Structure formats: structure tokens, C-alpha cells
């Protein structure tokens, strides 16, 4: 490579005024973009042989002139930074079949060090010793003249660095120094290389491409020009532009940007991040809910529920709350001073549902949430007369304080028969094939007292979607307390109980406990 430097005359000294007298067309383009011939140098005898007709045109010369009028600055970093504007040229006059090598170097424009003060550049001292010059060879080299003339020749991958120990081949520069890029066109030898003293080459210099290397932009006009013309200069844009860009991207999705000071929109809105999860649990309303009370309130929510689970699954929460008590506590927002209204509008019919704010429910799948709502359903038998009229569905709507955690062990769901059967004797329920229930050890478990009557909540009935033991002082039944499968009633076991030994509770589907005394 040392021979190449000697052959090209790529001295590392500052670029002198007579340095423009290069072997071939090296003068800058005229107003029409055509370079003019320069006086011949002593090497013109052999260096210009076959190179005299080559012409080079700088691409985007008008943009380079805009920067040059202000004072072009190029950022240098330790990792390396690309130039903007990019160095691109159009080459003509090459032999289509001859192979050429195109390369660049960047040499000091003078021996001064600069500083930017009072909104202008001024000389502040002598330049630091120049680093050993590096050549950047175009990746397509060597290539035929037809290849180079077919399209623009771009050096946009060239990077500038201030790391004197750079191992990546980037051009090493000093900050606050002025530099001049140069383009060299070399005719490849028989080995598709260059470096010998007899290598034919020519050099082209465009003064408008000179720049001062900086680690950060000094002139705000240069910064503005970079922003206006470089689509990748996002890091220099103002905070207002970045905020508007961020908000526009956020609003294009389903997650709206809602300021903290404003009242949040309805959860049932289509733009709510919870709308997709809620619709999985919805019935006929916009949002729906699996939390509805069965105290005479009919709803179509059971249509989307899966088949009942014959055995209750273990639950961590064993507290059973009375449905009427929960409705009174949830709907009396005035009794709790720390509850804040969620929406200022009055509840409507489409908002007549409970909102669940239990944090562990949000990360579950839709099917698991539905099953968990079944397992946690609180059976309300209406055994005791209510002390006050039952509130309507609008009265028990709890839209006003969804921030309060819900009682996960006392969720309420509408229970209606999935497929009502005609009245028949007790034995018919057990002798029919598809209606054999799985009653686990009914004789070994005493039923809890509910009011004055004795009722037993069975684990499963053919027309009962939700099964749960619900007594004032009993917990949830776990699978460990159930009997083995051999104790289940089967087709061959005769049942001789008569209809007068049991009665039904309307709308609930509960079977009473029977004994010899009844």
C-alpha cells in the first residue's frame, strides 16, 4: 500500500493550492456540471494514457453547496459515523471493457485547528500531526468501465472515526480540523490490483465537499440542514416533534394516549385495552359479565358457559359471602369515603353488570376465567325472607368504583336450567342413561343447615350448570373429600324413593337430603 501512496502522490501533507493540478480531469465541475481540464503534471506522460477522457460529476451538488455556504460539519465517533451528504458521483469516459478500481481518501485541507465562536469558524492554532492516511476502496472494485458508468458510484458506507486505533478500516480524522475528500480512479493491472509506479490513475477533487470534523454539531444552521434533508437524523429533532410522533403512533393502535388529568373513557369502549378480554366473557351486552346474581334476575350468560364440572376444584379462598350482603355493600358507595366514582354518568341498562378488578384474573385465558367463575359461584337459595325489597339490576350496578378489589370467593352468576326436564319421579333421574349423576358419598356427608330446611347441594345434576356447597359455616368441598368412583350410583342400582320424600327449590335446582324419618 506504500507503493500505492507513492504512485498516486497521496501525500499526507496539507492540500496546497497547486494540488489541484492532477494527472487528469481534477478541477471541480462548472455551473453546467462539466469538469475542465487542468494543466498537465510531470506524470501526465504515462498517467494520462487511457485516462484523459474520464469525466466525473458530483451527485446532489446543490445540496453540497448549501452546506458549503454555511460551513459543512461531519460528525466523527469512536465507532464510526457515515457522511451526510453522501459522496456519490457519476463517471463517464471509461473503457467499457477495462477494469478500474475506485477509491477515496480524505486529506487535511490546511494546517490549522479551528474553533466555533460568535457564530462563526475561526483559526485557533496549528493543526495536530496528521494521522497516517487510509484509503477506502469501493466494494465493487475491481469492475469494468461499463459497470461503473451504468449507475451512480456511491461511497455512502464510508465511515469517519476519531479512534486512532480503529481496526475496522474507517477513515481516521482529528476533531476541529478541516479535511478534503478526494476520488481516485485507477486502472487495474493484470492481477486486478494496483500499487506499482506504472499504474495509470487520475484524481478528482470537489472543493464544495470540504468539511470540518466535529464530535457534535457546532452551528445550529448545519443541524437544521441535516434535519431537513437527512431522514435518519431523528436524534436531533425537537422534543415536541418526537412527542407528536410518539402519540400518533400510539393512537393508531388500540391503546389510546389518555392524559392523567382527564376522566377515563368507558371500559366498554372499543379503544379500551380490556375490551378484547371482556368480550370473551360477554353475553348480549357490549361488555357483559360473568358476575350476575341469580335472585330472580334472568340473563343469557349461561349460554356461553362450558358444561358443568362434576367435581369442585380446590380453591384457596374458603369464605362464602351471602349474595344479598354483597349487593348491599357494593351498591352503597356513600358508606365508603375512599371510593371514588368511576364515571359521572348515570348507569344505564347496557352498563348493568359487575366489573371485576381482581388483578389475578387479567392474565388468565378466557376459558379458564369462565370455569373459575363457575367454580366460585355462590348458590343463593332464598331460604330466608329478605329484610328489604330486592334491588333491581340497575341498583346493583357497580360501575362507580371498579378500583375496589372484588371478593373472588363470592362471585355471583346467573343459574338457570340449561335444558328443563318435565316433572318425574326421583327414580327416573337415576335410571335414565345420560342422566346418571356423580353423587359422591352422599350418605357419609351431613348437609349444612340453610334457614329452617335441610338441603344438600350436590356436586352435579343433569340440568344444573353450577354446583357448590354454600352454607353459612362451611367451606368449599375439595376433591379429597369425595368417595372413590366405585361408590357412584350406576344404571343397575334401583332407587325406591317416592316423590313425597323430596321437594325442589324453584329456579335453583337443589335436591333435599332424605332420611328414614322424612
From Swiss-Prot:
SUPFAM superfamilies: p53-like transcription factors. Residues 262-301 have a biased composition (Polar residues). Changing residue 154 to A: Found in patients with familial dilated cardiomyopathy; uncertain significance; associated with significantly decreased transcriptional activity. It comes from Homo sapiens. One of its GO terms (molecular function) is DNA-binding transcription factor activity, RNA polymerase II-specific. Changing residue 237 to W: In HOS; extensive upper limb malformations; strongly reduced affinity for DNA. It is linked to Holt-Oram syndrome: Developmental disorder affecting the heart and upper limbs. It is characterized by thumb anomaly and atrial septal defects. Changing residue 170 to D: Found in a patient with atrial fibrillation; uncertain significance; reduces transcriptional activity; affects transcriptional regulation of NKX2-5 or GATA4. Keywords: Acetylation, Atrial fibrillation, Cardiomyopathy, Cytoplasm, Developmental protein, Disease variant, DNA-binding, Nucleus, Transcription, Transcription regulation. Residues 1-46, 250-356 are annotated as: Disordered. The T-Box domain binds to double-stranded DNA. Monomer. Homodimer (via the T-box); binds DNA as homodimer. Interacts (via the T-box) with NKX2-5 (via the homeobox); this complex binds DNA. Interacts with GATA4. Interacts with KAT2A and KAT2B. Pfam families: T-box. InterPro entries: p53-like_TF_DNA-bd_sf (IPR008967), T-box_DNA-bd (IPR046360), T-box_sf (IPR036960), TF_T-box (IPR001699), TF_T-box_CS (IPR018186). Acetylation at Lys-339 by KAT2A and KAT2B promotes nuclear retention. DNA-binding protein that regulates the transcription of several genes and is involved in heart development and limb pattern formation. Binds to the core DNA motif of NPPA promoter. Its main location: nucleus. The modification N6-acetyllysine is found at residue 339. Residues 58-238 bind DNA. Changing residue 325 to R: Does not affect transcription factor activity. One of its GO terms (cellular component) is cytoplasm. It is found in: Nucleus; Cytoplasm. This is T-box transcription factor TBX5. Residues 34-45 have a biased composition (Low complexity).
Amino acid at each position: 500500500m506504500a507503493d500505492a501512496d507513492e504512485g498516486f502522490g497521496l501525500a499526507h501533507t496539507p492540500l496546497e493550492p497547486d494540488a489541484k493540478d492532477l494527472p487528469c480531469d481534477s478541477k471541480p465541475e462548472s455551473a453546467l456540471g462539466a469538469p475542465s481540464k487542468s494543466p498537465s503534471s510531470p506524470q501526465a506522460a504515462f498517467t494520462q494514457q487511457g485516462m484523459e477522457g474520464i469525466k466525473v460529476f458530483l451527485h446532489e451538488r446543490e445540496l453540497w453547496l448549501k452546506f458549503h455556504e454555511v460551513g459543512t460539519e461531519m460528525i466523527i465517533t469512536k465507532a464510526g459515523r457515515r457522511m451526510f451528504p453522501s459522496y456519490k458521483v457519476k463517471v463517464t469516459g471509461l473503457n467499457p471493457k477495462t477494469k478500474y478500481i475506485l477509491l477515496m481518501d480524505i486529506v487535511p485541507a490546511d494546517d490549522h485547528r479551528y474553533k466555533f465562536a460568535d457564530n462563526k469558524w475561526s483559526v485557533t492554532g496549528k493543526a495536530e500531526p496528521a494521522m497516517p492516511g487510509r484509503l477506502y476502496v469501493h466494494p465493487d472494485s475491481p469492475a469494468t468501465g461499463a459497470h461503473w458508468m451504468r449507475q451512480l458510484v456511491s461511497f455512502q458506507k464510508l465511515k469517519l472515526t476519531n479512534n486512532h486505533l480503529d481496526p475496522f478500516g474507517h477513515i481516521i480524522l482529528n476533531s476541529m480540523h478541516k479535511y478534503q475528500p478526494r476520488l481516485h480512479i485507477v486502472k487495474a493491472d493484470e492481477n486486478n490490483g494496483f500499487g506499482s509506479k506504472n499504474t495509470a490513475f487520475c484524481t478528482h477533487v470537489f472543493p464544495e465537499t470540504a468539511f470540518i470534523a466535529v464530535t457534535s454539531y457546532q452551528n445550529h444552521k448545519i443541524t437544521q440542514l441535516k434535519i431537513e434533508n437527512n431522514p435518519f437524523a431523528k436524534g436531533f429533532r425537537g422534543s415536541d416533534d418526537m412527542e407528536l410522533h410518539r402519540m400518533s403512533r400510539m393512537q393508531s393502535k388500540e391503546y389510546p394516549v389518555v392524559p392523567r388529568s382527564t376522566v377515563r373513557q368507558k371500559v366498554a369502549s372499543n379503544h379500551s385495552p380490556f375490551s378484547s378480554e371482556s368480550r370473551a366473557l360477554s353475553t348480549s351486552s357490549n361488555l357483559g359479565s360473568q358476575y350476575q346474581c341469580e335472585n330472580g334476575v334472568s340473563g343469557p350468560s349461561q349460554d356461553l358457559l362450558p358444561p358443568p364440572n362434576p367435581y369442585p376444584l380446590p380453591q384457596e379462598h374458603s369464605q362464602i359471602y351471602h349474595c344479598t350482603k354483597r349487593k348491599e355493600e357494593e351498591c352503597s358507595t356513600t358508606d365508603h369515603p375512599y371510593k371514588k366514582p368511576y364515571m359521572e354518568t348515570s348507569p344505564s341498562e347496557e352498563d348493568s353488570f359487575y366489573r371485576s378488578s381482581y388483578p389475578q384474573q387479567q392474565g388468565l385465558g378466557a376459558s379458564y376465567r369462565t370455569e373459575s367463575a363457575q367454580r366460585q359461584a355462590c348458590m343463593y337459595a332464598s331460604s330466608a325472607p329478605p329484610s328489604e325489597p330486592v334491588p333491581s339490576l340497575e341498583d346493583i350496578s357497580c360501575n362507580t368504583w371498579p378500583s375496589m378489589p372484588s371478593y373472588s370467593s363470592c362471585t355471583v352468576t346467573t343459574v338457570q336450567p340449561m335444558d328443563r326436564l318435565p316433572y318425574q319421579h326421583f327414580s327416573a333421574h337415576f335410571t335414565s342413561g345420560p342422566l346418571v349423576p356423580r353423587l359422591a358419598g352422599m350418605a357419609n356427608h351431613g348437609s349444612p343447615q340453610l334457614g329452617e330446611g335441610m338441603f344438600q347441594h350436590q356436586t352435579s345434576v343433569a340440568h344444573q350448570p353450577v354446583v357448590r356447597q354454600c352454607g353459612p359455616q362451611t367451606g368449599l368441598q375439595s376433591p379429597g373429600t369425595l368417595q372413590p368412583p366405585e361408590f357412584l350410583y350406576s344404571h343397575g342400582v334401583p332407587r325406591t324413593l317416592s316423590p313425597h320424600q323430596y321437594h325442589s327449590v324453584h329456579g335453583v335446582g337443589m335436591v333435599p337430603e332424605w332420611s328414614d324419618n322424612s
